[in-house]
Amino acid sequence: LVDRDPVKTSFEEWARPGHFSRTIAKGPETTTWIWNLHADAHDFDSHTSDLEEISRKVFSAHFGQLSIIFLWLSGMYFHGARFSNYEAWLSDPTHIGPSAQVVWPIVGQEILNGDVGGGFRGIQITSGFFQIWRASGITSELQLYCTAIGALVFAGLMLFAGWFHYHKAAPKLAWFQDVESMLNHHLAGLLGLGSLSWAGHQVHVSLPINQFLDAGVDPKEIPLPHEFILNRDLLAQLYPSFAEGATPFFTLNWSKYAEFLTFRGGLDPVTGGLWLTDIAHHHLAIAILFLIAGHMYRTNWGIGHGLKDILEAHKGPFTGQGHKGLYEILTTSWHAQLSLNLAMLGSLTIVVAHHMYSMPPYPYLAIDYGTQLSLFTHHMWIGGFLIVGAAAHAAIFMVRDYDPTTRYNDLLDRVLRHRDAIISHLNWACIFLGFHSFGLYIHNDTMSALGRPQDMFSDTAIQLQPIFAQWVQNTHALAPGATAPGATTSTSLTWGGGDLIAVGGKVALLPIPLGTADFLVHHIHAFTIHVTVLILLKGVLFARSSRLIPDKANLGFRFPCDGPGRGGTCQVSAWDHVFLGLFWMYNAISVVIFHFSWKMQSDVWGSISDQGVVTHITGGNFAQSSITINGWLRDFLWAQASQVIQSYGSSLSAYGLFFLGAHFVWAFSLMFLFSGRGYWQELIESIVWAHNKLKVAPATQPRALSIVQGRAVGVTH
């Protein structure tokens, strides 16, 4: 299944800029060359039309990507080992903040090193690494060093693998298209054995070490990981059933293991994180599911599922040929494959964002509010990018890989044939959502300005309670006992029902109340998401042709206009739809992050007195303030931004500078988005004239950015 030595390793070849393209390799005539070089370097489709060669390049590039990821991880662990207060934080996580970066005293920058507690001065980090390290049982900086070195070794291995599997032993196309085998290995190997080994690590290393840490034992006194693995008596002291070894497993007396494989639900009141015994149980269960799933598909033996059969059998009474032909699409178009994967992974990433705060998985994560906010923001943004990427690659598939002559009356063909109905209805839904959701706010602003609070939509006047959401919350809060035997509490405290959990005088989590304010902003979310989908879906469904430009497929994925003499055909390419979709994705996620930040500070996060009185960070003002646009501007945007803007001269000044810098970058983007190409070309011509006059003109002709290039630079900034 492999070819030996298919491509020779040549440093001379790599050193030649643009070696992958005949035109670019000729060298620059104009400055457009450098843009084309960057645009096409990784567009393997443009290098060759041979699917096997493209597949090999993608496969090899994945190893390069993994190498970079290991390098990054190594850097994170190295910072933890070399520059951090991890051991101090471990001994007192409620009073000491995590820091892994100390700024050198150059031109006064050491002002950034704030006091994070315990006499350590540095920048407080919000990545959540300390919490993960504690959960995985890392007790010393030496262990972090070892892990960092291990990650570097793996980075080197991955780099080697990328070279080896392209230049020395490159898989044949048949190997890339053997989906059943791939599914079996990925499910059973990566997900199954991966989860099983993690569950094993948690049971044998994380659980005992965290038991000791929770009990207040000094990290230096705790036995090292290998001692727990080699010495069963150590574990048996904490979990007596360990003394029996594997006997209960083989005699099916599994309840013996209930000490360390639990099903409690809720949070550990000591750390404010999920019970680590629940997490270990979860990974064991997941491992078993995936190990079974990894044996479902038919390979060398004549048993199991065949993907092609499953897809072709999948048709309903109203859907024509159903999924017939989908198998061929997904095994010959990597763009189509990638599109599906991005859509699913993007959605999953957003689900992760919501679980990180509602079911905080690591010890002391819930009371580290900055980290909670950062993790939510990070996962929302990544999810948004992946979903827009899904639309981008779906459109590239439509333009480059879709063959309309062989597709008839399957689901994709049927969707394309009634795309006008889909898009016009979706457009109507967007208009409806936009006017109504915004209209509710405008109504409230107007009534507020007229001094008529009794006529506003609010929890104290005209109520618009999110009754369905409240019903879902209530159902989950009542679920333990009714549905899940043995579970003492519901999956998340946010559903309601339980008492709040406080750790070190700070609220970890409490039932999150939903009211009129949430109902209003929820419909803004619905509006922005639907508009994003409208733009992206229109780009995909009209990527090959439209009434305006019937031959769009011939123009490619990105083009500025349909040539001279065709007015009104600019910015219609599939690429332009991705460009516009990105802006709406930014829009949508901004509102989500605003909602989350304010809601959590107002109704969840805060301190708790000895008498049990909770004081929230913004004093519970979300319900009454966020129901007007003015409230959002005054009590959220200005109230929070003013603290950042006034941070100059304090250890927080970096955030003020970032805030300022981010707005500069944003303003800079407008220069590219509102620019006329001809204006710049004209300006360049006169600058070139001046250079010629002084006989210092370069051989490479300067060119203004093309329309598409300008928009690319703009949207990036």
Curated annotation (Swiss-Prot):
Transmembrane segments: 58-81, 144-167, 183-207, 279-297, 334-357, 373-399, 421-443, 519-537, 577-598, 652-674, 712-717
Annotated binding of chlorophyll a, by residue: M671, Y679
Alphabetic keyword roster: 4Fe-4S, Chlorophyll, Chloroplast, Chromophore, Electron transport, Iron, Iron-sulfur, Magnesium, Membrane, Metal-binding, Oxidoreductase, Photosynthesis, Photosystem I, Plastid, Thylakoid, Transmembrane, Transmembrane helix, Transport
GO molecular function, one term: 4 iron, 4 sulfur cluster binding
Gene3D superfamilies named among the record's database cross-references: Photosystem I PsaA/PsaB
Keyword Cell membrane: no
Positions annotated to bind [4Fe-4S] cluster: C561, C570
SUBUNIT field: The PsaA/B heterodimer binds the P700 chlorophyll special pair and subsequent electron acceptors. PSI consists of a core antenna complex that captures photons, and an electron transfer chain that converts photonic excitation into a charge separation. The eukaryotic PSI reaction center is composed of at least 11 subunits.
Protein family membership: Belongs to the PsaA/PsaB family.
HAMAP family the record matches: PSI_PsaA
Protein's name in the database: Photosystem I P700 chlorophyll a apoprotein A1
The organism of origin for this protein: Drimys winteri (Winter's bark)
